Amino acid sequence: MDREEARKRIEELREKINYHNYRYYVLDQPEISDYEYDMLMRELIELEEKYPEFKTPDSPSQRVGGEPLDEFEPFTHIVPMLSLANAFTAEEIKEFDRRVKEAVGEVEYVVEPKIDGLSVELVYENGMFTVGSTRGDGIVGENVTPNLKTIKSIPLRLKDSVNLVVRGEVFMPKASFAKLNEERAERGESLFANPRNAAAGSVRQLDPKVTAKRDLDIFIFNLQRIEGRDFKTHVEALEFLKEQGFKVIPLIKKCTTIEEVIKAIEELGEMKDSLPYDIDGAVIKVNELDKREILGQTAKDYRWAIAFKYPAEMKKTKIVDIVVQVGRTGALTPTAVLEPVVISGSVVSRATLHNEDYIKEKDIRIGDTVLVHKAGGIIPEVVEVVKEERTGDEKAFVMPDKCPECGALAVRLPGEAVRRCTGLNCPAQIARRIIHFASKDAMDIEGLGPAIISQLLSKGLIQNVADLYYLKYRDLITLERMGDKSARNLLEAIEKSKKRDLDRLLFGLGINLIGSKAAQVIAEHFKSMDNIMKAKYEDFLELPDIGPKMARSIVTFFSEEQNRRVVERLKEAGVNMEKLSTGKVSNIFEGKIFVLTGALKNYTRDEAARLIVERGGKVTNSVSKKTDYLIVGADPGSKLKKAQELGVKIINEEQFEAMLKGDIQP
């Protein structure tokens, strides 16, 4: 590799790593395994060391992680939450040992499991839990104190009135993860990919009540700082924390030689699949705290510790067939049917192939011999093809352009990796579609929740959203827990929903990429469902805030005959198909830009946004110098602080309502 090739490869690696950093640290939606990520980072570090002229301060090799999101207040860590350097072989562990001993002489090590969860910092003042934060970028994280307080293994008060800071890993036990996904599947909600994603998503919920319902746990693995006490070793400090009421990291083993360390790593690796929680490695730490002080740290990691990463177990097997499954969002996912093989203690007979690009990139064919592992220790995944074992009888796979469940068009929009079914009648996604249609921001059918929808579907009383308007009292009274009053109330709510405005109907149809704001723009312009269905791709592109993907999505949706039939049946049932007149509503917010933060008492965010847009205003998601008003509800996020810094006018819900009534002029 010459200098120019190295420069291009370094740029490519940085782009990939920054992308995956964003997916992992900011969105909590990783697309690759930790092992694959580590290999990318290792290659970048090696190239930058070989070509130091290309190393820059903003390279991902020089940083700890991703930026925190805006939903929570930022919190600057008392002690920076640095990462650990990684090792993948016994020789690399021995090299770490040599570096340590060159600096401080003989040492004692501890080996402990590396819990696969979400790292947090807990601050205690006078023995009381005061602040809990996520890692964020290592310097500034997110203040998630109310959510962490719902985890029962986190003590709210310590035994002693001490000031201290600890670091721990929040995780979800394997059994709890399986139960949670089972419950989400029953409700028609998207599933978590692995326990780590479930833990991270639960901690970062805006509503602590949601977090409280999730079975989260924590292991404390380090005492970051304490006032008025000294400890000689890490193990001694952990014993103190245990006495104070903390649940400390288990399976710790003290080692006096590097050979003992390697043996402890191997023993931990042998038992990891049988543990009730996920681990993705072992952490090796210097036990003596005074020697840690001497060893210190770099800008991104500690010199006194290293993480050994276990490679994902891979097995060889054969692809018998490739089938396509339709998810609840209409996404078509190719799945490999395999000759059964045991991986990490369980029999695997199917593996995800993600999407058609993944199949094409890896040149996966029916009949191929492949290597399979469990991504995140949970999801079976085809990693690569063993091409030298091909016989010539393998068959190429072609993604269908029709939904295998309902026969509707399966469309892949530009820039998207997945193909989606466009059918309103698709049985694979109908429950989710009806739940969305009945939701508060769409047709707002009070009393029509997931449980009732599930019963209606299982009894064959409905097959699509239009069928709701043909239900009779005799249909509803047969449902479980449905009495006379409940049945009549639901029929009344369904009848009432017929008068909803056009934008709410359009949003309720669940057209891919068309949210409530886009639906408002479209309804305001075209005025009727007939006009919308007749409109061409170019017509939608002329509208503000409607891009090419959204335009293509809505045109494709209405080109599908079964969707047009559903709309026709809605019309026959008496559902409003016109943009309702807003009466005497004036353009009092003309040219004004609003941002909303926190929970409003009398409106959802979409309802408040609709009122603003109807009156000529615009609603954006972030505060800037162009923002005219920030409407603040309960438990506002960091937008409030930014608005104060920029001098943006801040109003509460009562002032907003006064503006709507004309009592206050904007």
Curated annotation (Swiss-Prot):
Cofactor dependency: Mg(2+); Mn(2+)
Catalytic center residues: 114
Pfam families recorded: BRCT, DNA_ligase_aden, DNA_ligase_OB, DNA_ligase_ZBD, HHH_2, HHH_5, Nlig-Ia
Keyword Heme carried by entry: no
Residues that, per the record, bind NAD(+): 34-38, 83-84, 112, 135, 169, 285, 309
Any single GO BP term: DNA repair
UniProt keyword list: DNA damage, DNA repair, DNA replication, Ligase, Magnesium, Manganese, Metal-binding, NAD, Zinc
EC category: ligase
Top-level taxon: Bacteria
Keyword Iron-sulfur listed: no
EC number(s) on file: 6.5.1.2
GO cellular component, one term: cytosol
Annotated Zn(2+) binding sites: 403, 406, 421, 426
Function as written in the Swiss-Prot or TrEMBL entry: DNA ligase that catalyzes the formation of phosphodiester linkages between 5'-phosphoryl and 3'-hydroxyl groups in double-stranded DNA using NAD as a coenzyme and as the energy source for the reaction. It is essential for DNA replication and repair of damaged DNA.
Stored HAMAP family: DNA_ligase_A
Protein name, as recorded: DNA ligase
Species for this entry: Caldanaerobacter subterraneus subsp. tengcongensis (strain DSM 15242 / JCM 11007 / NBRC 100824 / MB4)
Source organism phylogeny: Bacteria, Bacillati, Bacillota, Clostridia, Thermoanaerobacterales
Gene: ligA
